UniProtKB/Swiss-Prot annotation:
Tissues/organs with expression: Expressed in venom sac and, to a lesser extent, in venom gland. Not expressed in brain.
Keywords from the UniProt entry: Disulfide bond, Secreted, Signal
Function: Amphipathic peptide which probably adopts an alpha-helical structure. Has no antimicrobial activity against E.coli DH5alpha or B.thuringiensis. Is not cytotoxic in vitro.
Localization terms from the record: Secreted
Protein name: Ampulexin 2
Major site of localization recorded for this protein: secreted
Keyword flag Secreted: yes
Keyword Signal on entry: yes
Superkingdom to which the source organism belongs: Eukaryota
Subunit structure and binding partners: Dimer; disulfide-linked.
Protein's organism: Ampulex compressa
GO-annotated cellular components: extracellular region
Signal peptide: 1-26
Length: 50
């Protein structure tokens, strides 16, 4: 059950990350929404745990 929740969580963050890529390049931090940046940071932490 926990694995399913983690998988769903990572998929959601991946989708959010793809939208942030469309709105602006990753290097332009001024245009990144703080919530999207927070989600990307969580996604990086999730990848490190695996």
């Amino acid at each position: 059950m926990k694995a399913i929740m983690v998988l769903f969580y990572v998929m959601t963050l991946t989708i959010i990350g793809s939208f942030s890529m469309v709105s602006g390049s990753p290097g332009q931090n001024d245009y990144v929404n703080p919530k999207l940046q927070f989600a990307c940071d969580l996604l990086q932490k999730a990848k490190e745990r695996q």
